[in-house]
């Protein structure tokens, strides 16, 4: 089966986005699917909700997007079998200046996911986005 990418996004806060992301990823993992959730929200609620301590987020999605780390090094285990996460930190809110000179910067994440064949080990990739309505809501 080819992997599926699911974006969980809404520009309004408080609509159940975190609950949906955590429950969907956990349910898929529970039936044996290999799941990667990428936390693209600087608040890091999906990361926290899946038990990733803030002190253990040295390689986050910020470092990946800013080309300071590769995607594979940022993937962390959760306490749930078959479920891994790339956590987020508040640093992600400052990613725009880092990408200002990048051509086609709106496609940065897509390039990373396709160029590195990073999703080959996963059946599903869930993109948990922020509430912000900006170019990098992914």
Give residue spans per PLM region:
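P-loop NTP-binding core
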Residues: 1-130, 137
